[in-house]
């Protein structure tokens, strides 16, 4: 399949809407062409291109809803998918929380498409792999990494006259570097809007340095430490916390934002006053589609403002039930910070621990967002503003809510992607006090 133009996408969606005999019909057409290259043990192992386009049709008879999808787009296929969705809707029980399709909306385009990223070809990917592998091989180090890039489009339409179309690109690179004896490990990751900003031959040096310097790690006693979390390390915890910003879960007593006696903490001070987080689909470095999965127009809005809960995620059903205004679910998380780099935060630290990355983060207690996870790929002891020596990795038990009340200093936000999050994020490196490490890990 090719990337459909706006006119081509609209023609398909118009046919689908016209074919439907249901009370209402919503159709989403999305496609992408993505390329990738994978390398391990200093050799390219796989590369390829994935081309996929899919149409999802949702119809309703009263409060009975059915959805079907297909990846063929001739007239017969379009009729088949519509009839299948209608058959499923007739068989479905009524949805007590059914909400009708949204009305016609107006969307302001966001800059989610980059020409340089869309122009990436196999030669570009091969050069990224070569620029990652060659310096490692020359220094007796072992590189393993993955680059994935792509371009795509999304279009949505419904029987109320709503229509939207926008093109997108994506670029994501990660590389882990190990010493030959496996005792040292370093990592670097880049999630970018514009591939022109990527320099593999420079970024690989970060992972190489950390791999070399993380050998001969010393054991520190578990306990509470001042830490500097690099943006990738902080992003995993913060993105996990944002899953609990549902107004419904807070109102029903299932969230750290639930209020004793009922209700939620909207408007209350929950974090350090330096914590501000917004969603903005038009952010130049971290743009997202200007609509959410229901077609609701996204807007620039504060989620946390000076430590106060400024907005919660109200679904259309819950907003109607509670007498609130529904807003689109955010697609990005943009946290404010200062101007310092991670290195500058290190230079201003008397004693502490630098954490490159956190991983395998899991929930311990949803009422406090207590999380557990591990550090990896470069954990270092800081003394008198300098990296003194590597330390063995830790298991941590920490709540990002407590973490964001123990801020010493915030650095300059950078774009990162969480390992298990769909958010596009701008997160600063952060210096925190009393971060809780509970045990040691022998992994590197």
What residue ranges belong to the model's regions?
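Active-site bordering "gate/hinge" segments
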Residues: 1-289, 296, 305-308, 331, ...
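Dual-mode signal for accessory low-complexity, basic/Gly-rich regions
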Residues: 262-444
């Amino acid at each position: 399949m090719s990337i459909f133009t706006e006119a081509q996408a609209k023609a398909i969606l118009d046919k689908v809407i016209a074919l439907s005999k249901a009370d209402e019909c919503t159709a989403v057409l999305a496609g992408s062409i993505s390329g990738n290259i994978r390398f391990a043990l200093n050799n390219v192992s796989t590369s390829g291109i994935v081309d996929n386009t899919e149409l999802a049709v949702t119809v309703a008879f009263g409060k009975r809803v059915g959805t079907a999808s297909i990846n063929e787009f001739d007239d017969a296929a379009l009729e088949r998918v519509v009839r299948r969705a209608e058959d499923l809707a007739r068989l479905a029980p009524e949805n007590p929380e059914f909400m009708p399709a949204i009305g016609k909306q107006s969307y302001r385009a966001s800059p989610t498409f980059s020409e340089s990223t869309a122009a990436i070809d196999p030669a570009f990917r091969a050069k990224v792999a070569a620029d990652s592998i060659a310096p490692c091989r020359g220094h007796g180090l072992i590189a393993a990494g993955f680059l994935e890039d792509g371009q795509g489009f999304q279009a949505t339409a419904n029987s109320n006259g709503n229509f939207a179309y926008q093109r997108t690109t994506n670029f994501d690179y990660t590389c882990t570097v190990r010493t030959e004896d496996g005792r040292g490990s370093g990592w670097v990751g880049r999630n970018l809007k514009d591939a022109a900003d990527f320099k593999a031959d420079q970024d690989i040096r970060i992972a190489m340095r950390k791999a070399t310097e993380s050998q001969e790690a010393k054991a520190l006693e578990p306990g509470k430490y001042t830490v500097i979390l690099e943006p990738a390390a902080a992003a995993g915890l913060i993105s996990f916390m944002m899953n609990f910003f549902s107004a419904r879960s807070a109102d029903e007593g299932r969230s750290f934002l639930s209020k004793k006696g009922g209700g939620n903490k909207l408007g209350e001070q929950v974090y350090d006053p330096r914590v501000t987080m917004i969603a903005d689909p038009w952010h130049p470095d971290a743009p997202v589609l200007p609509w959410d999965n229901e077609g609701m127009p996204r807007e620039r809005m504060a989620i946390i403002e000076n430590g106060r809960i400024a907005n919660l995620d109200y679904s259309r059903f819950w907003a109607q039930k509670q007498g609130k205004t529904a807003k689109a679910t955010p697609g990005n998380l943009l946290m404010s910070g200062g101007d310092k780099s991670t290195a500058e935060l290190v230079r201003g630290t008397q004693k502490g621990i630098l954490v490159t990355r956190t991983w395998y983060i899991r929930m311990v207690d949803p009422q406090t967002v207590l999380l557990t996870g591990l550090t990896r790929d470069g954990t270092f002891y800081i003394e008198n503003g300098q990296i003194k020596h590597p330390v063995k990795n830790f298991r941590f038990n920490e709540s990002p809510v407590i973490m964001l009340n123990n801020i010493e200093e915030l650095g300059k936000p950078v774009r990162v992607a969480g390992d298990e999050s769909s958010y596009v994020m701008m997160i600063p490196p952060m210096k925190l006090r009393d971060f809780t490490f509970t045990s040691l890990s022998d992994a590197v």
